[in-house]
């Protein structure tokens, strides 16, 4: 297995231009495909998850032109639903941001009735999709499971989504609601969506609603408990769509600045629509010095205090707090993160296991993790398992800010969202 060893880093300094956001990139491509008109999507992320969406759209008859560096994509909108070849099978890797929205969009009524299969990597077949399928079936969709009940692969017939009143469980993943919301305007009737349980990761729903607005569709949001969407609408291309820099990817660089120097990230700022921009607020609560601009966020070192906080609103960036916590002067507790368990891997178990390897004292619960700080000279050199999870690899690069090297196994797993991560991280590092 490939591995990379990061030598101890004495300080960090510099500016990082962030790659485009994964969440925004895949939403933008799907909305552009369904819209009337041509959309030029700029600052698109070049990564595995985006490639899976692009390959799927091509197979579904969407025409697009991708620039040589794969960051600009001109998409010719279909002005409505997909025309599906019968018995087409789409392989979506481990890309939840492709699997969930496409599951809903492919239920919409096509010109001719066809069946399509959605599948992916072995881990994708372990990631739940039951709540989305249940909600779509309530709205009249025709979906069946091909292997295990509640999980991909799926067979979908494009008979249409009728709309009406739909209840959806919001407690596992906000992507289920995102998928339903993005397809609802093309349903045959109006849709009223009621959320059962607590809706997780609300800021990701804000991203979805803002992007639907950019493509000409309004949704009535009643305190995240009920959403009303008019049916029989069309998305309208905004002609150009700029993808913001990835706020989740920003977290590793901002944390490095807070721990040991000063780092600025560009491509995201105080008006960002991404919830993970709030990661900088968490660093500030811990004591770091944060500066916000229109198009940048900067984090500067100060003494860091532990924190006890509900981080349900920033589940991806919360992982970065888990490794940052080792450099604080008191205990950190990250709460209400059950949905870590249904991500690329069971992140709660993985995080606790790997933190212990570097010498940390950790308590992992069903939906929380408690982490004790670790003096710089007590870190152990460990081989970090990444579980084919891009965020595990990136989070644990911060361990090199101690007096100890860290070895990351399978570093290429960052290709899911940030193929050049380790090159970029190296740029801000001053070695001993």
Swiss-Prot record:
Function as written in the Swiss-Prot or TrEMBL entry: Catalyzes the transfer of the enolpyruvyl moiety of phosphoenolpyruvate (PEP) to the 5-hydroxyl of shikimate-3-phosphate (S3P) to produce enolpyruvyl shikimate-3-phosphate and inorganic phosphate.
Recorded family membership: Belongs to the EPSP synthase family.
Subcellular location, principal: cytoplasm
Active site: 316 (proton acceptor)
Name of protein: 3-phosphoshikimate 1-carboxyvinyltransferase
Highest taxon of the lineage: Bacteria
Molecular-function GO terms, alphabetical: 3-phosphoshikimate 1-carboxyvinyltransferase activity
Residues reported in the UniProt entry to bind 3-phosphoshikimate: 22-23, 27, 173-175, 201, 316, 339, 343
UniProt-listed PANTHER family: AROM/DEHYDROQUINATE SYNTHASE, PENTAFUNCTIONAL AROM POLYPEPTIDE
Catalytic activity: 3-phosphoshikimate + phosphoenolpyruvate = 5-O-(1-carboxyvinyl)-3-phosphoshikimate + phosphate
GO CC annotation terms, alphabetical: cytoplasm
Pathway assigned in UniProt: Metabolic intermediate biosynthesis; chorismate biosynthesis; chorismate from D-erythrose 4-phosphate and phosphoenolpyruvate: step 6/7
Catalytic activity, EC: 2.5.1.19
Keyword field contains Acetylation: no
Chain positions recorded as phosphoenolpyruvate binding sites: 22, 96, 127, 175, 347, 391, 416
GO biological process per UniProt: amino acid biosynthetic process; aromatic amino acid family biosynthetic process; chorismate biosynthetic process
Signal peptide (from-to): none
InterPro entries, sorted: Enolpyruvate_Tfrase_dom, Enolpyruvate_Tfrase_sf, EPSP_synthase, EPSP_synthase_CS, RNA3'P_cycl/enolpyr_Trfase_a/b
Localization per Swiss-Prot or TrEMBL: Cytoplasm
Top EC class, one word: transferase
Subunit structure and binding partners: Monomer.
Gene: aroA
Origin species: Haemophilus influenzae (strain ATCC 51907 / DSM 11121 / KW20 / Rd)
Pfam families recorded: EPSP_synthase (PF00275)
NCBIfam families recorded: aroA (TIGR01356)
UniProt keyword annotations, A-Z: Amino-acid biosynthesis, Aromatic amino acid biosynthesis, Cytoplasm, Transferase
């Amino acid at each position: 297995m490939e591995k990379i060893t990061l030598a101890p880093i004495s300080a960090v300094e510099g500016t990082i231009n962030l790659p485009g956001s994964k969440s925004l990139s895949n939403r933008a491509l799907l909305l552009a495909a369904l819209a009337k008109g041509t959309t030029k999507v700029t600052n698109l992320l070049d990564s595995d998850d985006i490639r899976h969406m692009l390959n799927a759209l091509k197979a579904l008859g969407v025409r697009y032109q991708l620039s040589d560096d794969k960051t600009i994509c001109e998409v010719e909108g279909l002005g409505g639903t997909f025309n599906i070849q019968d018995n087409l099978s789409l392989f979506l890797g481990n890309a939840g941001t492709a699997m969930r929205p496409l599951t809903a969009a492919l239920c919409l009524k096509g010109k001719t009735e066809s069946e399509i299969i959605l599948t992916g990597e072995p881990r994708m077949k372990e990631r739940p999709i039951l709540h989305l399928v249940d909600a779509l079936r309530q709205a009249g969709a025709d979906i069946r499971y091909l292997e295990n009940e509640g999980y991909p692969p799926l067979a979908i017939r494009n008979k249409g989504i009728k709309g009406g009143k739909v209840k959806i469980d919001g407690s596992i993943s906000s992507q289920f609601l995102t998928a339903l919301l993005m397809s609802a305007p093309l349903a045959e009737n109006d849709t009223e969506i009621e959320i059962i349980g607590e809706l997780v990761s609300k800021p990701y729903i804000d991203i979805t609603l803002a992007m639907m607005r950019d493509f000409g569709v309004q949704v009535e949001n009643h305190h995240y408990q009920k959403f009303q969407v008019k049916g029989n609408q069309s998305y309208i291309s905004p002609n150009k769509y700029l993808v913001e820099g990835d706020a989740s990817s920003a977290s590793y660089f901002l944390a490095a600045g807070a721990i040991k120097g000063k780092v600025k990230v560009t491509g995201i700022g105080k008006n960002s629509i991404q919830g993970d921009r709030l990661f900088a607020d968490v660093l500030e609560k811990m004591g770091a010095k944060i500066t916000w601009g229109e198009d940048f966020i900067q984090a500067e070192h100060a003494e860091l205090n532990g924190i006890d906080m509900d981080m349900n609103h920033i589940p991806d960036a919360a992982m970065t707090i888990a490794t940052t916590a080792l450099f604080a002067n008191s205990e950190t507790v990250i709460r209400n993160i059950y949905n870590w368990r249904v991500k690329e891997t069971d992140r709660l178990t993985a995080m606790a296991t790997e933190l212990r390897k570097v010498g940390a004292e950790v308590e992992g619960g069903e939906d929380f993790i408690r982490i004790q700080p670790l003096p710089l000279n007590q870190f152990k050199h460990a081989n970090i398992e990444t579980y084919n999870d891009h965020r595990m690899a990136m989070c644990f690069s911060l361990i090199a800010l101690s007096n100890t090297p860290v070895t990351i196994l399978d570093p290429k797993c960052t290709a899911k969202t940030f193929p050049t991560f380790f090159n970029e991280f190296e740029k801000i590092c001053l070695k001993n």
